[in-house]
Amino acid sequence: MLRSLVLNEKLRARVLERAEEFLLNNKADEEVWFRELVLCILTSNSSFISAYKSMNYILDKILYMDEKEISILLQESGYRFYNLKAKYLYRAKNLYGKVKKTIKEIADKDQMQAREFIATHIYGIGYKEASHFLRNVGYLDLAIIDRHILRFINNLGIPIKLKSKREYLLAESLLRSIANNLNVQVGLLDLFIFFKQTNTIVK
């Protein structure tokens, strides 16, 4: 089933079109990189659609607000975890102006090292969110393993729960093998799997 999706010319064209957008983001300015960081912080433990809606609601105001004001805006936007994410976003906004320069310098040399740096130094970001962020700014060699992808792996008969870094890397290794077999970059594989389960490409 997954192979047939990857070989589907129309779907593959849509995925490759998204990949071009990611690669263009890599050349974009700090504002775009910061936007993607905000989106990935909001996407954690939330749906992409909810996160995207809230990001658009707060993005042009967040740099001028304190934590409480960010929390109120998130609540107004309908976002569920408004207090927790306000705390993360308030810390993240202090990185504005340094996000692209700092991360690109590392990621251009080693994408896995860049992910480790992000997951270690940016509050509210784990391996999945760091991989998602890096993919969205043009680095396609890391797996984004959300609940849809985890369900796909579990349906293969592999009981991984992603409760540790070790399990994430194990799942990523499996997905990398599948991606290589299908001749697609692992950073795009989740788009095919997400489409298989939801019939949409949004990420």
From Swiss-Prot:
Record bears the keyword Hydrolase: yes
Record's keyword terms, sorted: DNA damage, DNA repair, Glycosidase, Hydrolase, Lyase, Multifunctional enzyme
Catalytic activity: 2'-deoxyribonucleotide-(2'-deoxyribose 5'-phosphate)-2'-deoxyribonucleotide-DNA = a 3'-end 2'-deoxyribonucleotide-(2,3-dehydro-2,3-deoxyribose 5'-phosphate)-DNA + a 5'-end 5'-phospho-2'-deoxyribonucleoside-DNA + H(+)
TM segment ranges: none
GO MF annotations, alphabetized: class I DNA-(apurinic or apyrimidinic site) endonuclease activity; hydrolase activity, hydrolyzing N-glycosyl compounds
EC number: 3.2.2.-, 4.2.99.18
Important for guanine/8-oxoguanine distinction (site feature) positions: 203
GO biological process per UniProt: base-excision repair
Domain of life: Archaea
Residue ranges of coiled coil: none
Active site annotation, chain numbering: 128, 146
One Pfam family this sequence matches: Ogg-HhH
Family listed: Belongs to the type-2 OGG1 family.
Function: Catalyzes the excision of an oxidatively damaged form of guanine (7,8-dihydro-8-oxoguanine = 8-oxoG) from DNA. Also cleaves the DNA backbone at apurinic/apyrimidinic sites (AP sites).
Protein name: 8-oxoguanine DNA glycosylase/AP lyase
